[in-house]
């Protein structure tokens, strides 16, 4: 029997009970309050109104529930129905995630665009996140009936594309004895490929599993991270390194190049898979990612060129999409990242931008009439940020075979007006281990990436010492010297402004010129050229070694050239006599990694030897 409220009529499906419905009492932007919600659970998914808008219960009082709705709530009226679904907001995990683009609640945007023929998402649209009709090539491991499986075990492989193998993972809460495993062949993600019997109960499993977004996926144990996240950006790899499984924050005002750095990480880092969450970003930036990524290629160790998009998943929640879904998009992204981590992959997750995520929290908190804290943000802002960054780390995965995986989180934060005392910024900096601070003045001077080497830091240098010792035992000393030169230049700049460069000591002139070499020809990098868009770590080390070698030799020559009859070797003489070598130092960045490591290292070694020989000749002549 239809239930009539006012002039609206609610019709129930045959499978639904009237008791599963509540009714709207109040609408305030994305926040809806519904009555008659006895028995509802926190974070339960509900369908709101006649358009079946997706919502999530975020507060329960008596029989009324406060719901945040992930779609535009215009047109909802009092007494509209609210249907409970008895399950939390979850994401679908299985083959087909990579190369896809979802919104904040994992609706596939490409599929919706095809079905609706519109540039906007229709309200209440319900499309399965993963294509249920695609056939995947299922290759089971060497398992048979009677074998035992436990949560987290890898029992099959699916070639998701020519770049990534998708390991089919048994859900963490499942275990039992195999009663059926599908033979190798083509199956959809809805076909039963495994049956397990445990305590007399037989459970069927497909390649698809769902997981609640607000529940972290379990792991066997956390491990200490000791492998660097190589980004291809010299300033990050050499001076402020992160690790696979680290937490990083890119901080900078608008227009400093945060998005370019996070896109460079997605394109060139040594991660196996990338989850890029555009959280409240401009739609044009997500469109740029969608246009660029499919055309970008990465060279594999065997020489094959593959599209970067094949290892990437995009979660797009642009600034004109509903605010509540922006808050959920971070959790959707992290759940997808944890799923690939459980296969034994190193995953990078880019969250762009954390500030707009915090603004979404602030808006919802305001609608709920919660007590505002600093700058109107809710008091639990720091706790929410911490729980998000806590998902990062290197872990020993559940189940067999034994494997390690990691999730690296890189969060971009744009403090208003570049003010680093902003609550979101200070809360983020108290959590993350690596801080890449972008400088507006550097960006205005067209120095990109505009990472300020005086304020940025990395707390992972100690954890990576063993890696550097194996790679190049001299690197740590060279890096320390380079940092000292850059710091000394900052101190000297004030003196130069007062008395001019000519009044400085010879060693100080050398410091200023070496710092200029480091700044303009080492730390600055042109992302739009073939030779400099990506810098392998060996090239970064050799470039820095040669610049610091020049600095050390020039200082020694000046000291030895000082005598009772005055300064025989001045810095101006060094520049005059060694102009061609100085030019070769400046030109190191133009060496193209495509020539191969051996060819480049030979060139850098030759320059190193030529510098030593030239300074020796200069000293011999002036004796």
UniProtKB/Swiss-Prot annotation:
Keywords: ATP-binding, Hydrogen ion transport, Ion transport, Nucleotide-binding, Translocase, Transport. It is an enzyme of class 7 (translocase). It catalyses: ATP + H2O + 4 H(+)(in) = ADP + phosphate + 5 H(+)(out). Gene3D superfamilies: 2.40.30.20, 2.40.50.100, Bovine Mitochondrial F1-atpase, Atp Synthase Beta Chain, Chain D, domain 3 (1.10.1140.10), P-loop containing nucleotide triphosphate hydrolases (3.40.50.300). CDD domains: ATP-synt_V_A-type_alpha_C (cd18111), ATP-synt_V_A-type_alpha_N (cd18119), V_A-ATPase_A (cd01134). GO terms for biological process: ATP metabolic process. ATP binds at residues 252-259. GO terms for cellular component: plant-type vacuole; proton-transporting V-type ATPase, V1 domain. It comes from the Eukaryota. V-ATPase is a heteromultimeric enzyme composed of a peripheral catalytic V1 complex (main components: subunits A, B, C, D, E, and F) attached to an integral membrane V0 proton pore complex (main component: the proteolipid protein). Catalytic subunit of the peripheral V1 complex of vacuolar ATPase. V-ATPase vacuolar ATPase is responsible for acidifying a variety of intracellular compartments in eukaryotic cells. HAMAP family: ATP_synth_A_arch. Belongs to the ATPase alpha/beta chains family. This is V-type proton ATPase catalytic subunit A. The lineage of its organism: Eukaryota, Viridiplantae, Streptophyta, Embryophyta, Tracheophyta.
